[in-house]
Amino acid sequence: MLSSSHLKPSAPSATLLRFLRSQSDFLSVNSSRCARPSRSKPYVHQILPCNASSRASSTWTCTASAPHRTTLQTSLVRTPTPAARSHSSSRPRLWLCAGQAGRSSSIFPLSNAPYSRSASTKSRPLLRRLLDLRRSNSSADKHNRGGPALIDDGTEGGFTIGRGLAAKATNEPRLRCTEFDKNGNVTLVNGEFKKSELIAKYGLLPRDLRKIDSSTLPHILVRPSAILINLLHLRVLIKHDRVLVFDAYGSTDSYMQSLFVYDLEGKLQQKQTGGFGALPYEFRALEAVLISVTTGLEEEFNGVREPVVRVLRALEEDIDRDKLRHLLIYSKKLGTFEQKARLVRDAIDDLLEADDDLAAMYLTERANGVQREEDDHQEVEMLLESYHKVCDEIVQASGNLVTSIRNTEEVVKAILDANRNSLMLLDLKFSIGTLGLATGTLFSALYGMNLKNFIEESDLGFGAVSMTCFMITAVVCVYGLAKLRKLQRVRMWGEAGVGGAPLTPLTTRSGILSGHRSNWRADSIEPVWGSLPGEARTERIKRLRETAAAAAARSASADATAQRASALRSSANANGGAPKGSEHSPTRETEASGSSA
């Protein structure tokens, strides 16, 4: 048995504290002294560490110690379950009291220590005890199996961010490509590269690869050591001694891309002499790309143009609903193709307008240390201009076809409007005839009543009433048709034409056009307007006004000559006779004036 001498407890080692920390469930700070169990049972296992001078021993009776500073208490207590709570008094508990030391407090910061159960259960508030008793067995077992958290909560966010960045780096998208060396041989087929690897290997920027991934707008980008091309189905990276062809949309069985790979291999394997007109490595690759792009555009345009032309020819013969629907579908396809070809042409045009980019496309010379002036780029400019012309021709042809579709649609609308107007006129004619018959039968309905009309005994009553009804019907029909014809006659120059005189009317049905229906595609309408070929509207109006003024002047001069002749004749009659040779003078003067006019 140990005597109750005053012993100053020593601080436990760091290894022991870490072990107890890993095995304990809670960590608490006892501000006064080591609390002893509040149970009145005599058997409590308690250990008090002693100084180095005195050896510690264990006893079954609690030894009292003198008051000392706040100690650090660590307890190994299992979370009691409802079944084992009744036997908790018979189980020994291990209590360790240690003096507060500097190194122990530095190892376990008290500010971050979670709140734990006190040694005395009764010293806690009632609400905390009730909540503690309501814990489920599953949660307690899970908490005991999990062990204490050896990492502070403040560092969990950093580890979460690190795991997210690591997962993002692991899931970085890869680009599959085929690589050609300086001799045109394929060194890598369907090789996968990360974007970061391509950026570091070829000296690119992330935005450059973003433009390669995009499948909407064509681009030709010139960088200090590479040329990036994104045209239609091709995504190519050109170096001075290497070419990378990226897979189109992740597919390896593209027909156009396969043709391009074979063509590119043949272009790069051509032995170029050092004479005039020899193209460097990067220009041969660029030419292969442009040939593939223009060939694809031409084939696609031929595939779109043929059905459009066939539908347009069919619409000239018969305007059908199905044909109009097919025309709408082909018109949409043609519009999409025209936009695509226009974007390719604009991409080449933008490159031609940048002199610094054209001079920077000489990658072989730059790799050899040769610098070109900004205006010294005749070879690449001629190469790009030739294929720009091809793309421009395709754009113009597709634009002309789109214009033909628009014109055909307008003509079809005009024809359908004319047919609709004809049907409306026919309906109006039937309505006018029905109105005339209804007006005529009104009188017969009046005579059909059983009333006295004072003509029952007359022999001419039936005929007179019938003739009156027919006459009223005819008058109403003729009047209605006349009004309809007057409303149907619509002129672009008004009722009287230009200058109050009507224009030259069309030939009658008995004329040349009788029995012949002109085609709606006729280009000339001079007989309608009375104009000369190639004459503008303002010139035609001016000519018509001058003609009207000349006719008015001729009529005025003729009236003046007639008045002068009548005055001479009256004066001659007043003198009693006219001399010989003067009888026909007025007539001669009239003829002379007419010839002069």
UniProtKB/Swiss-Prot annotation:
Transmembrane domains' residue ranges: 423-443, 462-482
Pfam families, alphabetized = MRS2-like
* Major subcellular site: mitochondrion
Q: Which InterPro entries match?
A: MRS2-like
Q: Where is the composition biased (Low complexity)?
A: 552-577
- Which GO molecular function terms does the record list? magnesium ion transmembrane transporter activity
Q: Which UniProt keywords apply?
A: Ion transport, Magnesium, Membrane, Mitochondrion, Mitochondrion inner membrane, Transit peptide, Transmembrane, Transmembrane helix, Transport
Q: Where is this region: Disordered?
A: 552-597
Family per record: Belongs to the CorA metal ion transporter (MIT) (TC 1.A.35) family.
| Subunit relationships | Homopentamer. Forms homooligomers. Interacts with MFM1.
Described function: High-conductance magnesium-selective channel that mediates the influx of magnesium into the mitochondrial matrix. Essential for the splicing of mRNA group II introns in mitochondria by affecting mitochondrial magnesium concentrations, which are critical for group II intron splicing. It also suppresses a variety of mitochondrial intron mutations and its absence may disturb the assembly of mitochondrial membrane complexes.
Query: Can you name this protein?
Result: Mitochondrial inner membrane magnesium transporter mrs2
The scientific name of the source species is Aspergillus fumigatus (strain ATCC MYA-4609 / CBS 101355 / FGSC A1100 / Af293)
